[in-house]
Amino acid sequence: MSRRVVVTGIGVVAPGGIGAARFWDLLAGGRTATRRISLFDPARLRSQIAAECDFDPSAHGLDDETVRRCDRYVQFALVATAEAVRDAGLDTTREDPWRMGAVLGTAVGGTTRLEHDYVLVSEGGSRWDVDHRRAEPHLHRAFAPSTLASTVAETFGAQGPVQTVSTGCTSGLDAVGYAYHAIAEGRADVCLAGASDSPISPITMACFDAIKATSPSNDDPEHASRPFDARRNGFVMGEGGAVLVLEELEHARARGADVYCELAGYATFGNAHHMTGLTREGLEMARAIDTALDMARLDGTDIDYVNAHGSGTQQNDRHETAAVKRSLGEHAYRTPMSSIKSMVGHSLGAIGSIEVVACVLALAHQVVPPTANYETPDPECDLDYVPREARERELRSVLSVGSGFGGFQSAVVLTGPERRLR
């Protein structure tokens, strides 16, 4: 693939920071956005905490009709895409619509709207013979995962590759990766790529409660998410969305766009092992890392920072540490590796794209965001996890990795423009 892909715009809706500037302030300051859930009464849940977005759709330009027909996760994506397009200085009306794509990821789609409408049509969940007359006319559009990509495409005029990606917690990374391939292989010149999820709802929270994946530290929410720490006890649910404008390099140059960085490599593999279990050796994640590095024509020793999946579960953090050491060798011990989930929670399908935006900003600022709440070392997690405080560092190439229920293992490599765009 000879066509090179660059990032020219970013947009983000995240807990504690809507807009790239506020999002970066949160990360650089090492602050956490976890609080007791306010979107519904969580009293009957094991985990009653989450990282919510302080989100008013009308304050971000969404009209009443859009709010009625779109679930919260689609609203996040529309706001993030609008910011990314503005940031890129991209006039979508002047682009060839057949050469502009929209690839968006989600893990749970419109679960919140589906829950809400089920209560309406079933007399509060008491009847199976539902009353269809009570269903909202926008229900299908609101909950169907396909709506995410189609709504962004419709709003911004993209008629090229339009796709919703749903690969669990790697959906955001994979959406960015699939958009990368669409441009690199010549099927598009521009792609709006990212992901969005709003999983802080009773049924989704209950799903993760049932398998004890989420943290029960309800009495100390700000310190509940502690990836790689020996006392970690599960992840904190989050929500949000992030979108990047990806362009073919010469297309970006022709319109005089500023370039953040190059998306230089991407790979994804499955472990064919278990729905939630991970192999201790991290072979599949290591293979994704190695393949993404090969695509970027880089070696493990070229990586200056690893943005970890770092969910804060016991098995994930061991698995990921092993994978990074397998791929980077001794260089892993000299490479900072941090998890922003410690600050913004785990927004399932959205987090991969949110983390890619964090990597873009890390390259732009030459700063590594910290792992908040990391205090007690785990002998099996023995790398440099950037405890509690951001760190200035020369960054030229960064790696972002993700792991998803179902065995998905993905990796993206980003390089600063001064390294490769001469």
UniProtKB/Swiss-Prot annotation:
One of its GO terms (cellular component) is cytosol. The active site is at 169 (for beta-ketoacyl synthase activity), 309 (for beta-ketoacyl synthase activity), 346 (for beta-ketoacyl synthase activity). It comes from the Bacteria. Pfam families: ketoacyl-synt, Ketoacyl-synt_C. One of its GO terms (biological process) is fatty acid biosynthetic process. Gene3D superfamilies: 3.40.47.10. NCBIfam families: PRK07314.1. Involved in developmentally regulated synthesis of a compound biosynthetically related to polyketide antibiotics which is essential for spore color in Streptomyces halstedii. Belongs to the thiolase-like superfamily. Beta-ketoacyl-ACP synthases family. This is Putative polyketide beta-ketoacyl synthase 1. It comes from Streptomyces halstedii.
